UniProtKB/Swiss-Prot annotation:
Domain BCNT-C: 282-359
Gene Ontology CC annotations of this record: nucleus
Family: Belongs to the SWC5 family.
UniProtKB keywords: Activator, Chromatin regulator, Nucleus, Transcription, Transcription regulation
Protein name: SWR1-complex protein 5
């Protein structure tokens, strides 16, 4: 029984042993508490240790978190407040502040838009303070605006004419009006007026070979035209036509203009009837069938073809009379060349005489 109390006392002594935190790996000291312990010293320690040897404490955990959450707006707000206080002090000391020292951005109490530090520029404030001009009113108008608007919208063309213009028109003499009316009637009737006699129309039909092709032309032209004269100069006979034939030819020409080419069959279209396959087959040429042998005509060169085209252009442009007048004039190309040759010969003769006199 005596051994049991001894063991109990040993156990009690083991429990009362002092705990060493340096040997415990799981023990971690709170940094805030550690800083507090370092900074918070007794009065005796402060008296004995000099101030230069005091340990400087770093930023606390709360200050670090605030710095991480700082987006720059807080610094902007503080800068604005500091500048505003500086301006107020400057105004008190100097009396008035010069405009040259002011920045482009003015900071007022109303310009701060809250925690974001939004500021309004000078142009933005002026735009906000600018008053819109009121719309025009017709309260003091002496003219009936509605009547004028209705008159302007009226389909009558004389609505936009001023009264002064109408008075000037009424003041013109009646003789001028009669003259203008007569000239206007003449201008209107002149295009539609028919000549006293009808031109004799002839039918030209020619067949010729040019550039390997057989061309057949059939035209109805006036007998006095350039094409008719060129055709008659070759000794060909023409056929005189009547007015009915001319109208029929004109109607046929108009009908041809309205015709449109048929749609060409494509190889990519569906082919239920086999029409596309037939279109692929090579068609027999005119030479194989002997059609060229039946058609006879003279072979013309480029000069003769140009002469035919020029005659057609003269009739189409209506410059036959103008060409006839210039062809009879003395100031033609050959006459000018003769004049220039005479001038050159005279100069050479004068030079030769000058050289002979010098000798």
């Amino acid at each position: 029984m005596a051994s049991e109390p001894a063991a109990t006392v040993a156990d009690l002594d083991f429990d009362n042993e002092q705990y060493d935190s340096a040997e415990d790996e799981d023990f971690q000291l709170d940094p805030d508490q550690e800083d507090a312990d370092l900074t918070g010293s007794d009065s005796d320690d402060e008296a004995t240790e000099p101030a230069a040897k005091r340990r400087k404490t770093g930023p606390t955990k709360a200050a670090t978190e605030d710095q991480e959450l700082d987006s720059g707006d807080e610094a902007m707000i503080q800068k604005v407040k500091a500048r505003k206080e500086g301006k107020q002090k400057g105004k008190k000391s100097q009396g008035t502040a010069s405009d040259e020292d002011e920045d482009d951005v003015d900071f007022d109490d109303d310009d701060e838009g809250g925690p974001g530090g939004f500021v309004r520029t000078r142009a933005m404030r002026m735009r906000m303070q600018e008053e819109r001009k009121p719309l025009a009113k017709i309260d003091g108008a002496t003219v009936d605006v509605d009547a004028i608007w209705a008159q302007m919208n009226a389909p009558d063309s004389s609505a936009g004419i001023l009264p002064s213009q109408t008075q000037a028109k009424d003041a013109t003499p009646a003789k001028d009006e009669n003259k203008n009316a007569d000239t206007a009637e003449e201008q209107v009737l002149s295009p539609d007026s028919k000549p006293q006699y009808k031109e004799e129309m002839v039918k030209i039909k020619r067949t010729y070979k040019f550039a390997g092709e057989v061309i057949t032309e059939e035209k109805i032209v006036p007998k006095d035209s350039a094409e008719a004269k060129l055709f008659l100069a070759k000794g060909e006979s023409v056929e005189t036509v009547t007015d009915a034939d001319v109208e029929h030819a004109a109607n046929a020409k108009d009908a041809l203009k309205l015709r449109r080419p048929l749609r060409k069959i494509s190889r990519f279209d569906p082919n239920p009837t086999g029409t596309i396959k037939k279109s692929w087959e090579k068609q027999p040429t005119a030479g194989i069938t002997g059609q060229t042998e039946n058609i006879s005509g003279p072979k013309i060169n480029t000069v003769e073809k140009s002469r035919l085209d020029w005659a057609a252009y003269v009739d189409q442009a209506g410059i036959k009379d103008e060409l006839k007048e210039h062809s009879k004039a003395k100031e033609g190309f050959l006459g000018r060349m003769d004049f220039l040759n005479r001038v050159v010969a005279k100069r050479e003769e004068e030079r030769r005489n000058a050289r002979l006199k010098g000798l």
